[in-house]
Amino acid sequence: MKVWDLHCDTLSELRRAEKNGTPASFAHNDLHIDLEKLQAGDYMLQCLAAFVNLADPTPGVDPLVTALEEIDVFKRIMAKYPDRIAPVYTAADIRKNAEAGKISGLLTVEEGGCCKGSLGVLRRMYELGVRMMTLTWNHDNELAAPQANPGGPLAAQTQRGLTETGFAFLAEMERLHMIVDVSHLSDRGFWDIVEHGTRPFAASHSNCRALCPHTRNLTDAMIRALAEKGGIAGLNYYAAFLDTDPAHPEACRSTVERIAEHAAHYKQVGGIGVLALGSDFDGIDGHHQLETAADMPLLADALRRAGFTEDEVERIFWRNARDFFEHNL
């Protein structure tokens, strides 16, 4: 079964290892994702995010520099292993890699604040290969409010959404065909995208709030709106986004059966076409039944046991995402 994953934080972990003087190989490492694991899991495409924490306490840290350094990690990986993985910028690139038996690497950004409110920087990100970006992570920025209170508990910021600059970014991202990713965005920000956006968008790594009352997840109304817009949502494997007690994530469970339950709810509310995978690998901690990218057959089997047909499992694993990017890159 082919796999298409909308989100991971592996670039950030590789950059961190380099900064710590213990560089890790992308061919084989102790992370959730490396080339060996991707090939063992039969991956067709992996979205690799340049992740930025605007509250990074490191002295002198610059969010734009952080993003550029992680993009540099991406570029070096693609140059080092050209026979096994290759970057993609268009739908044609994805088809070409599939025909050549190569994994596709699609560059994304997690935290639009790294652009510092500059449309020029946004356009430069596109030129560097970024094809999808979240407007926020867990901190307010020039573009929008997130689903988190910095230094406090996660809470839906229902009255604060996109800023004037955020709306300008939305328009420019749509012009460029850089996919808008609403994961981490506030509830009000989500509806700003629905009401003002003109193109399909993604929630790359978000689950169902009806099953797990965490503001990182989507309400049923959001799922329906996402589906009506032709968008897509990636199932996140993080226990606190799957189970029912976000205040005590250590008590939550990340099992393939629980992921399948979220998949079933997505299907019931938004239809099978809205579903994809968004692991959040290398950005999540705790115990997960899907320990690495090589374990994806476990999820396929769980979906079958939950009553999904073989056609539906394929759609969740790769075909819905393939069709979405085919029409929106």
Locate each region found by the language model:
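Conserved, mostly hydrophobic/aromatic
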Residues: 7, 38, 90, 129, ...
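Short acidic/histidine-rich active-site segments
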Residues: 236-237, 270-293
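Structural preference for beta-strand elements that scaffold enzyme active sites
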Residues: 2-5, 45, 86, 104-108, ...
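Short catalytic helix/loop segments, enriched in acidic residues and glycine
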Residues: 19-40, 298-300
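A metal-dependent hydrolase metal-coordination microenvironment
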Residues: 30-32, 36-123, 138-175, 188-191
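Histidine/acidic residue-rich metal-binding segments in metalloenzymes
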Residues: 117-127, 149-202, 215-229, 257-275
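Mid-to-C-terminal alpha-helical segments outside catalytic/metal-binding sites
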Residues: 291-329
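Active-site beta-loop-alpha junctions enriched in small/polar residues
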Residues: 9-11, 51, 90, 110-112, ...
